[in-house]
Amino acid sequence: MNTLRVATYNIHKGVQGLGPRRRLEIHNLGLAIEQFDADVVCLQEVRKVHRREAHYFTHWPALPQADFLAPEGYHAVYRTNAYTRHGEHGNALLSRWPVLDHQHEDMSDHRFEQRGLLHSELLVHDIPVHVIVVHLGLIRPSRLRQLAQLRRYIAREVPSDAPVLVAGDFNDGRALVARELAGSGLQSFDGASSPTFPARLP
């Protein structure tokens, strides 16, 4: 198989900051994603709709954020993780390659954090490739249970001989994910990277 260029990005619902000083970043995010020139982009905290923010920001996109952010010619897949008073948000995948199928599984571990995984099957050079986008919990015991669920999901839903990629926001700075998933045959990407967390508002 040829090289597959992949990016993952928690877009924080397309908004930077909190309260009355928050600013709309979704248009800048669209430019950044175009510059990635990635075959696959895995996104977390993606708004499908948010009525309050759409009323607050003059240039709030008319399209759901996944469709708005997809570069020309890309396929956009979105599934909701969380329903709120004013809208809903979840994970998304943008793919240069055709999407054969997709599904969602709830990974919420407690009532304060609604989490889920988005599983898409892509056709890359005539080879089915499975991509799973996750956003794990903030609390370590929750992440451990979610990783156990992810292992079970892969064993159940992904053929043992199929290429599979897991990407997303792991909320993990101590290699917990790599250790927990090693037994599933997954390998950590060891290329150059730079930390994006901790930060005041990452």
Residues covered by each model-derived region:
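His/acidic metal-ligating clusters that form di-metal
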Residues: 119-124, 128-130, 142-168, 172-179
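Solvent-exposed loop/turn segments connecting transmembrane beta-strands
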Residues: 85-86, 110-114, 140-142
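Active site of divalent-metal-dependent phosphoester/diester hydrolases
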Residues: 22, 57-63, 67, 72-93, ...
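Active-site metal-binding loops of divalent metal-dependent hydrolases
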Residues: 10-11, 45-46, 134-136, 163, ...
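Residue-level detector of structured alpha->beta connecting loops
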Residues: 37, 73-74, 96-98
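N-terminal, active-site-proximal structural segment of metallo-dependent hydrolase catalytic domains
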Residues: 1-71, 83-88, 148-151
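Surface-exposed cleft-lining segments at the edges of enzyme active sites
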Residues: 13-20, 49-52, 103-108, 134-141
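Beta-strand-turn-beta hairpins that frame and shape the catalytic cleft
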Residues: 1-6, 89-91, 95-101, 113-133
